[in-house]
């Protein structure tokens, strides 16, 4: 019998949630996703030193201003890592906009344009890129405009139905609902443990998936942020699942037989009127878990972005 990972691949597109080239070679995913935390981790891998050196040298040619050099080196490094990953995956790479721009639509759009340009200068067509944005109202509005330009987006840090609905209504290419972080919040809040079937993160993604399919939305649902393979198995059939190397290894070493759990609706019905900004903010605010986890996620990505910039600043000074 095929291992659990190979079985899963027959129902769901598997995406590697890592910047580690060796892990991607090992598990042969369709796509890969990165974020500031993963870029920071990847930047400490010795094999990547040439990519960092290239980003530093390039940034020095763009500007004499150190703050601009740091910004440029950070963007160039993310793209350099993405370009390497794209040599190994047949599909797409997700590269994230600076989390500190999560509440600034115009600057998010400008950063997305810059990342796309850097990829194109490296010979990568925009059809192989997903621009990652936090699922704030401003991020969703930025994505709507980018999608209209033909730049596909991955809306991340998604914890609530309101965020998912707004993304679909904006015509976003893909969303990344965070399964494990939802579970973390509920375990801490209630003091209870949950099995995979009743896992609040699994329940959330299932609800979003069913809503999208019932209403004929084309937005791809990509479950993310897993804590155990039980969550992953319960979401077999989801459009895509992005999984870190340790859980990919566990799935590859497992012989558990799986069946699709998420099955698209056979008929669709028209959706209602799109959410207004006021409705979105109210609905989102009614979910304390989502409010907490979105804010925390943005803060933590910003912290790791800052750590990366400290490292780059030291290298730029040499």
Curated annotation (Swiss-Prot):
GO molecular function (one): transaldolase activity
Database matches in SUPFAM superfamilies: Aldolase
Keyword annotations of the record: Cytoplasm, Pentose shunt, Schiff base, Transferase
Catalytic activity: D-sedoheptulose 7-phosphate + D-glyceraldehyde 3-phosphate = D-erythrose 4-phosphate + beta-D-fructose 6-phosphate
GO biological process: carbohydrate metabolic process; pentose-phosphate shunt
Annotated Gene Ontology cellular component terms: cytosol
Matches recorded under CDD domains: Transaldolase_TalAB
Pathway info: Carbohydrate degradation; pentose phosphate pathway; D-glyceraldehyde 3-phosphate and beta-D-fructose 6-phosphate from D-ribose 5-phosphate and D-xylulose 5-phosphate (non-oxidative stage): step 2/3
Entry-linked Gene3D superfamilies: Aldolase class I
PANTHER family noted in UniProt: TRANSALDOLASE
Annotated family: Belongs to the transaldolase family. Type 1 subfamily.
Subunit structure and binding partners: Homodimer.
Name the UniProt record assigns to this protein: Transaldolase
Organism name: Shewanella sp. (strain MR-7)
Gene: tal
């Amino acid at each position: 019998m095929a291992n659990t990972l190979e079985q899963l691949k027959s129902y769901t597109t598997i995406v590697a949630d890592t910047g580690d080239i060796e892990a991607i070679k090992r598990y042969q995913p369709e796509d890969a996703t990165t974020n500031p935390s993963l870029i920071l981790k990847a930047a400490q891998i010795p094999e990547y030193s040439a990519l960092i050196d290239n980003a530093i040298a390039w940034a020095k040619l763009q500007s004499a201003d150190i703050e601009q050099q740091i910004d440029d080196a950070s963007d160039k490094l993310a793209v350099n890592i993405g370009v390497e990953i794209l040599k190994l995956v047949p599909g797409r790479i997700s590269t994230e906009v600076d989390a500190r721009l999560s509440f600034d639509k115009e600057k998010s759009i400008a950063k997305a344009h810059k990342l796309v340009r850097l990829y194109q200068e490296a010979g990568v067509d925009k059809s192989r890129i997903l621009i990652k944005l936090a699922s704030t109202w401003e991020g969703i509005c930025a994505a709507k405009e980018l999608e209209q330009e033909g730049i596909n987006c991955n809306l991340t840090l998604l914890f609530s139905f309101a965020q998912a609905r707004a993304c679909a209504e904006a015509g976003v290419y893909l969303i990344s609902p965070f399964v494990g972080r939802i579970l973390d919040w509920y375990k801490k809040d209630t003091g209870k443990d949950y099995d995979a079937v009743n896992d609040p993160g699994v329940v959330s993604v299932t609800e979003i998936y069913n809503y999208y399919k019932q209403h004929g939305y084309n937005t791809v649902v990509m479950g993310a942020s897993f804590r155990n393979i039980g969550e992953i198995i319960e979401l077999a059939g989801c459009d895509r699942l992005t999984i870190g190397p340790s859980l990919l290894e566990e799935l590859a070493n497992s012989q558990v037989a799986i069946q699709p759990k998420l099955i698209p609706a056979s008929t669709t019905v028209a959706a209602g009127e799109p959410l207004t900004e006021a409705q979105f903010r109210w609905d989102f605010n009614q979910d304390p878990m989502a409010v907490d986890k979105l804010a925390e996620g943005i803060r933590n990505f910003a912290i790791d972005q800052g750590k990366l910039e400290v490292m780059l600043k030291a290298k730029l000074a040499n």
